[in-house]
């Protein structure tokens, strides 16, 4: 993990087209702005993990349902 120190108003670049800017620093909280291409998905980690879990649940197959389809 790379750890970088930034002050309010300062930015860092990821590759050529993703810019992260520190916009506000409060007690125990940092507000950041992210400028990235529209094709890049940006999610908070807790939301990303929730989406991944829902995707895993969505691909589970009910074997009894498949057996019933096969019998027809």
Curated annotation (Swiss-Prot):
Cellular compartment(s): Cytoplasm
Signal peptide (residue range): none
InterPro entries xref list: CsrA (IPR003751), CsrA_sf (IPR036107)
Top-level taxonomic group: Bacteria
GO molecular function terms listed in the Swiss-Prot or TrEMBL record: mRNA 5'-UTR binding
Pfam families hit by this protein: CsrA (PF02599)
Primary role: A translational regulator that binds mRNA to regulate translation initiation and/or mRNA stability. Usually binds in the 5'-UTR at or near the Shine-Dalgarno sequence preventing ribosome-binding, thus repressing translation. Its main target seems to be the major flagellin gene, while its function is anatagonized by FliW.
NCBIfam families, A to Z: csrA, PRK01712.1
Family: Belongs to the CsrA/RsmA family.
Listed name of the protein: Translational regulator CsrA
Species annotation: Clostridium beijerinckii (strain ATCC 51743 / NCIMB 8052) (Clostridium acetobutylicum)
Gene that produces this protein: csrA
